[in-house]
């Protein structure tokens, strides 16, 4: 390394101040105003069934630093530093020793699917033409909303901008937030059943040859976006409330989504990961939902795929856990979302004292749900060759590295990825030998795209 990375000094103890939303004003309206005012901002929220996870929503605006990563390069506020590994270089930028057990700011952004080469140096993956491999904003202040109590909290780490927030709150008292507008048009449709079938058959040949046990193959649809992508997110959050909902806008890059899948969470030393694989559609009523769920739980292909993922998650968590602490807390639950039902399990473990949130996330990246097994073989020699187009942020990680050493990341699926006026949606399905009907796999991809497609359809121009 020819240049020394800057060290960002952050106080150990953050400040928290209670604010008040005027009666009748929602936290969402506050974000509308912030998004219109600040070029770089984020909203992280949840509509999950876990009370702890869904209780808090977080807003950040105008980060103190903007960090981009590509192989061999870490870019900080436009200045490029040659580094051995841009991902692990994040660890060097500050100390992550905040004394708060609550959220106190940190790095918010995404790792693209191609970031796998940061953890597996032998991989040579094609870069996405429109999205950097990694981009994060460092947010040292922001807003936390407690949905249970209605309390609005402003936190900061020495750079207090509470006066700016109060100005926005006063503005909301006087006038309603302006609803964002956007129109979209389809530029490139997804693949036909025939082309997808050829891809599935090609993947099956790799499975038969023993090159992989399971492989995730899919495709994308490309759209032109005119207007504000926040309008699309507003629609998506209404039609597909999910455990992980996010709107992250950094420079020209915007990721918006409603993902059912947690990638990795570290909270006060406990790691959690959630295998989510096995998919069926929603029924027209509760009775059909139950019948479809029962069929899902007795489907040999879906059971085989999910069992493989449980093993992958146990192995991933076990790489950085204290010996003997890894266990499957829940197994084969069925989670229901707006358009699909999934089989879900939970794997937990206690982080080793030699590890941290960066090595913890790295051990789980990317999730086998989006790659297959073994990961290197599936990623480098099969998926990229068969799919042809690089995945970009899809299937990577979106979330936050906290200044207190905790982190939460979701898998960016059921998402829309925008750069300038170009956006895409993508989905994939698992290929397991002996259990594949190409037409079913094609329909699974269509089902997975359904919520984002519906949101986009509601914004199509004349």
UniProtKB/Swiss-Prot annotation:
- Record bears the keyword Lyase: yes
Q: Which residues bind L-tryptophan?
A: 46, 243-245
Under InterPro entries, the record lists: ADC_synthase, Anth_synth_I-like, Anth_synth_I_N, Chorismate_C
Name the needed cofactors: Mg(2+)
What pathway, per the record?
Answer: Amino-acid biosynthesis; L-tryptophan biosynthesis; L-tryptophan from chorismate: step 1/5
Print the keywords alphabetically. Answer: Amino-acid biosynthesis, Aromatic amino acid biosynthesis, Lyase, Magnesium, Metal-binding, Tryptophan biosynthesis
Q: Which residues bind Mg(2+)?
A: 305, 444
The Swiss-Prot or TrEMBL record annotates one GO molecular function as: metal ion binding
Q: Return the cofactor note field.
A: Binds 1 Mg(2+) ion per subunit.
> What is the regulation of this protein's activity?
Feedback inhibited by tryptophan.
Q: In its UniProt record, which GO terms are filed under biological process?
A: L-tryptophan biosynthetic process
Q: What is its EC number?
A: 4.1.3.27
Q: What residues does chorismate bind to? A: 278-279, 394, 414, 428-430
Reaction(s) catalysed (UniProt annotation): chorismate + L-glutamine = anthranilate + pyruvate + L-glutamate + H(+)
Q: State its role.
A: Part of a heterotetrameric complex that catalyzes the two-step biosynthesis of anthranilate, an intermediate in the biosynthesis of L-tryptophan. In the first step, the glutamine-binding beta subunit (TrpG) of anthranilate synthase (AS) provides the glutamine amidotransferase activity which generates ammonia as a substrate that, along with chorismate, is used in the second step, catalyzed by the large alpha subunit of AS (TrpE) to produce anthranilate. In the absence of TrpG, TrpE can synthesize anthranilate directly from chorismate and high concentrations of ammonia.
The family note in this entry says: Belongs to the anthranilate synthase component I family.
Oligomer and partners: Heterotetramer consisting of two non-identical subunits: a beta subunit (TrpG) and a large alpha subunit (TrpE).
- PANTHER family annotated for this entry? AMINOBENZOATE/ANTHRANILATE SYNTHASE, ANTHRANILATE SYNTHASE COMPONENT 1
Q: What is this protein called?
A: Anthranilate synthase component 1
The species is Leptospira biflexa
**What gene name is given for the protein in this entry?**
trpE
């Amino acid at each position: 390394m020819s240049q020394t990375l800057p060290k960002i000094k952050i106080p150990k103890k953050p400040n928290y101040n209670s604010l008040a939303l005027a009666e009748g004003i929602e936290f969402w309206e506050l974000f509308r105003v912030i998004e219109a005012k600040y070029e770089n901002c984020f909203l992280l929220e949840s509509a999950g069934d876990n009370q702890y996870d869904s209780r808090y929503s977080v807003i950040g605006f105008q980060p103190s630093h903007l960090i981009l990563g590509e192989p061999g390069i870490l870019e900080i506020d436009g200045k490029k530093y040659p580094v051995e590994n841009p991902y692990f270089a994040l660890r060097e930028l500050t100390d992550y020793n905040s004394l708060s057990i609550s959220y106190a700011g940190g790095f918010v952004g995404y790792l693209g699917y191609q970031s796998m080469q940061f953890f597996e140096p032998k991989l040579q993956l094609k870069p996405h033409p429109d999205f950097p491999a990694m981009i994060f904003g460092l947010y040292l202040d922001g807003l936390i909303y407690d949905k249970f109590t209605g309390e609005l909290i402003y936190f900061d780490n020495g750079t207090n901008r509470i006066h700016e927030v109060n100005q926005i709150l006063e503005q909301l008292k006087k006038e309603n937030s302006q609803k964002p507008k956007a129109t979209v048009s389809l530029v490139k449709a997804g693949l036909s059943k025939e082309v997808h079938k050829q891809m599935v058959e090609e993947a099956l040949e790799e499975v038969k040859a023993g090159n992989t046990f399971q492989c995730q193959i899919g495709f994308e649809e490309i759209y032109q976006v005119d207007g504000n992508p926040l309008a699309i997110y507003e629609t998506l959050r209404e039609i597909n409330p999910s455990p992980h909902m996010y709107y992250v806008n950094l420079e020209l890059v915007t990721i918006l989504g409603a993902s059912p899948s947690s990638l990795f969470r570290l909270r006060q030393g406990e790691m959690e990961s959630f295998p989510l694989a096995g998919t069926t559609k929603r029924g027209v009523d509760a009775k059909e939902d139950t019948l479809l769920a029962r069929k899902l739980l007795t489907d040999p292909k879906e059971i085989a795929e999910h069992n493989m993922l449980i093993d992958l998650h146990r192995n991933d968590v076990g790489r950085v856990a204290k010996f003997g602490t890894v266990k499957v807390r829940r197994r084969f639950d069925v989670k229901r979302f707006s358009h699909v039902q999934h089989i879900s399990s939970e794997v937990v473990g206690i982080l080793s004292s030699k590890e941290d949130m960066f090595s913890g996330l790295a051990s789980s990246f990317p999730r086998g749900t989006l790659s297959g097994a073994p990961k290197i073989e599936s990623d480098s020699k099969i998926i990229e060759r068969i799919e042809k187009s690089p995945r970009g942020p899809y299937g990577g990680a979106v979330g936050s590295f906290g200044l207190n050493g905790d982190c939460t990341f979701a898998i960016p699926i059921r998402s829309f990825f925008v750069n300038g006026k170009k956006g895409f949606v993508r989905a994939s399905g698992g290929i397991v030998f002996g259990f594949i009907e190409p037409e079913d796999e094609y329909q699974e991809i269509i089902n997975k795209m359904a919520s984002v497609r519906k949101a986009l359809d509601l914004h199509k121009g004349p």
